[in-house]
């Protein structure tokens, strides 16, 4: 797997969960002898929703809600076979979306 790179993108609503998962991935990759770049924090996406509280009148009465999507990027440079096997066996939290691409 020389001259290869594994790029891992993580997404989660909870920043503590995504930081914990990133730490696990980085620790696993370093333990197997791969060089790690990151974790790189990507911009947080904030979705805001405004909802009318009253069903009929009172346009001024509104509630506002927000969902934040936190993102991290990890590059694993020159991964070994042990690195790939260890990453495949890694069990991450349920609230974290993981996208892996080889480049």
UniProtKB/Swiss-Prot annotation:
- InterPro entries attached here? Ribosomal_uS10, Ribosomal_uS10_CS, Ribosomal_uS10_dom, Ribosomal_uS10_dom_sf
Q: Name one GO molecular function term.
A: tRNA binding
Kindly give the PROSITE patterns that the UniProt entry links to this protein: RIBOSOMAL_S10 (PS00361)
Q: Which processes are annotated in GO (biological process)? A: translation
Family that this chain belongs to: Belongs to the universal ribosomal protein uS10 family.
Q: Which key words are in the record?
A: Ribonucleoprotein, Ribosomal protein
Q: What does this protein do?
A: Involved in the binding of tRNA to the ribosomes.
Assembly with partners or alone = Part of the 30S ribosomal subunit.
Lineage per the UniProt record? Bacteria, Pseudomonadati, Pseudomonadota, Gammaproteobacteria, Alteromonadales
| One matching Pfam family | Ribosomal_S10
Signal sequence coordinates: none
Identification of the protein by name? Small ribosomal subunit protein uS10
């Amino acid at each position: 797997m020389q001259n290869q790179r594994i790029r891992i993108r993580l997404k989660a609503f909870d920043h503590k969960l995504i930081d914990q998962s990133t730490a696990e991935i980085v620790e696993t990759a370093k333990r197997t002898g791969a060089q790690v770049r990151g974790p790189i924090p990507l911009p947080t996406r904030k979705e805001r929703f405004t909802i009318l509280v009253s069903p009929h009148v009172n346009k001024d009465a509104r509630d506002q809600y927000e969902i934040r999507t936190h993102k991290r990027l990890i590059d694993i440079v020159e991964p070994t076979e042990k690195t790939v096997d260890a990453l495949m066996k890694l069990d991450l939290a349920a609230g974290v979306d993981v996208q892996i691409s080889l480049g």
